[in-house]
Amino acid sequence: MVRTLNNCPAPAKLNLFLHVTGRRADGYHLLQSVFQLIDRGDVLHFSVRDDGLIHRSTELAGVPADSDLVVRAARLLQTEAKKQGKTPGADIAIEKKLPMGGGLGGGSSDAATTLLALNHLWQTGLTRAELMALGLQLGADVPFFLFGQNAFAEGIGEALMAVKTPESWFLVIEPGVSVPTQQIFSSLELTRDTKPVKISDFSRAQESFGKNDLQVVAANLFPPIADAIKWLQQFGDARMTGSGACVFCPFKEEQQVDAVLATVPQQWKAWKAKAITHHPLAYLAT
C-alpha cells in the first residue's frame, strides 16, 4: 500500500467570464462561467497515519486548521472511509503559492487535491462523481477541480460541461487586497439579471467573450483592483477573476507576456501562467 503522495499540484483557475443570471430562493446566486485551469497553484504533500488523526503540519496565517478546507475535506472523506470499516489518518503539508481571497480558487483546489490524493492513499475507491458530490458540501468551486478539465459552469457553479478553450498565456496581477466573496455577492450594486448564454456562444467567440459581473462591485470597493485593471487594459482584454482580487490578461505568445511582465509597476506582485487542458491529478479518479 502506498503511504505517501508528495508534490501534488492544486492548480489555480481563472474565470474567463462570469455572469450572474439570477438568485435562488435560498440566497445562492445562479452563475454562468468558463473555468480555465492554469499551470500555477499550491502544492500539497500527504502521508498516511495509522492513528486516525488528520494533522495539517503547515501553519497558515489567519486559517485555523479546523476551518481549513483541506482539513475539512480530509475529515469528510474519512467519514466515508469509516463506513467501509477503516479509520485512516493523514499528515498534510501545504506549500501556499496562491494568494488568499484572490479569486483563483486556491482553497477549493487544495480541497479537491486532498480528496483525490487521500481517496487514492486510503483506497476508499470513490468515483469522480462521488468525490464531486462530497466536494460540493465544501464549496461551489470544489467540484470543478474534481471534474478534471476546463468547464462551462452553470447553477451555483456545480453544473459542469467540458469546454475547449483557446491556447493562451496569462499575465496575472495580485493587487494586494483580499476580497471577501460574501461582501461582493451581497452588494446592492451587483447585477443579478444578465441574460443567460449557451456554451456554443462562448465556443464561437471565445476571446473577449462576456464580462465579469462581480468586477464593477469589487473595483468600487477596492480601488487597487480598479487600478490594476486600468493598467493591464493597455495590453488587452484585462478583467478580474472570480470575486477578485486578482486581475488577468490573456496573450497568444509567451514572449508577449514576458514583455509586459517586465513593465508591471513594483507595487503589484505579478506572474505568468499557461492555460492547461486537464487537472494534473485527473488520472486519480474515474
Curated annotation (Swiss-Prot):
Gene designation per UniProt: ispE
Enzyme Commission number(s) of this protein: 2.7.1.148
Enzyme class of the recorded protein, top EC level: transferase
Keyword Kinase: yes
Protein name: 4-diphosphocytidyl-2-C-methyl-D-erythritol kinase
Keyword check for Nucleotide-binding: yes
Matches recorded under InterPro entries: GHMP_kinase_C_dom, GHMP_kinase_C_sf, GHMP_kinase_N_dom, IspE, Ribosomal_Su5_D2-typ_SF, Ribsml_uS5_D2-typ_fold_subgr
Binding site for ATP: P99, M100, G101, G102, G103, L104, G105, G106, G107, S108, S109
The family this protein is said to belong to: Belongs to the GHMP kinase family. IspE subfamily.
Pathway(s) the chain acts in: Isoprenoid biosynthesis; isopentenyl diphosphate biosynthesis via DXP pathway; isopentenyl diphosphate from 1-deoxy-D-xylulose 5-phosphate: step 3/6
Domain of life, per lineage: Bacteria
Known catalytic reactions: 4-CDP-2-C-methyl-D-erythritol + ATP = 4-CDP-2-C-methyl-D-erythritol 2-phosphate + ADP + H(+)
GO biological process, one term: terpenoid biosynthetic process
Single GO term (MF): ATP binding
Active site: K13, D141
Database matches in Pfam families: GHMP_kinases_C, GHMP_kinases_N
Stated role: Catalyzes the phosphorylation of the position 2 hydroxy group of 4-diphosphocytidyl-2C-methyl-D-erythritol.
Keywords: ATP-binding, Isoprene biosynthesis, Kinase, Nucleotide-binding, Transferase
